[in-house]
Amino acid sequence: MSLFAQQEDVDKLQENARTFMQHGDYANATLILTRAFQLEPQNLQIAKELSLSYFLQNESQKAMDVIKPFIDNTNSADDQAYQIAGTIYRKLGQPKDAEKLYKKAIKDFPNSGGLYNDYGEMLLAAHDPESIKIWEKGIQMDPSFGSNYYNAAKYYYYKKDNLWCILYGEIFINIESFTARTAELKDILLDSYKRFFATPDLLQNVKNRNDFEIAFLTCMNKQNDVVIRGINPETLTMIRTRFILEWDKSYAAKYPFRLFNWQEQLLQAGLFPAYNQWIFGASQNLAAYQNWTGNHSSEADEFKQFKAGIIFKVPQGQYYH
């Protein structure tokens, strides 16, 4: 068989296997990928897919046997291969091996958000407080990867650090906008704003806050005359509008921040009320939100189209924690 014909065969096998995997038929996917792997035993992509297919059938040792030769050879693996291997080690009940692997992988791939996320989740499962440091490092090194924001926002929610829960939670729902995790964090965001403004003077205790945090609190502290009306989508729209105008005037040049730029962009497009309804409406009152979208259908549709045209990415160098 010519190399070209063999490549065609391998590509077709992979395509068929992916179709089976998409339908949850991992047994057939494994059967096909095994044949593809026999044809190209050095093909990392096939190895990753075969290992994952074994893993999804609860055959973790077979999954490890496939992927381990690649991670043992530093030049053969990518960050995804390390992620797969780390997940398998955890399933096999070998956390020390997993931790050793994650540390090595992060050294080799320091900008891989997925590695930090998985390592942090493993530490969290072991009740290790270092987990948040790992997620924070992931946010710093790979700022457009969503899951580190998700885990950090939930961590800060339970630790009652509402400032960072608010910021990281909203960044996350703009990176990952239409999943169950999105809905979960929308609920957390609304509750965090209520808890955040439960303190009448946000600058009362800032001894351990950095300059960026104090700037944020200073701008938010000026919105107390709106807060006394209660926290709901309408008052949050007003609070956040005034915040952005104040931030733009006083701090935007010193602290460029993608989330605030996005909010300003929506303000200028006249879509900020719809955006705030999208975040807070259903969490506050589903019936009221449905009523709002019914009465503002063109605005709601325009926001959806506008957001669909945006891939929310956070630039490097905007890390202030």
What is the predicted function of each stretch?
Residues I46, A81, L115, N148, ...:
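TPR alpha-solenoid repeat register
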Residues S144-H321:
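Eukaryotic alpha-helical solenoid repeat scaffolds
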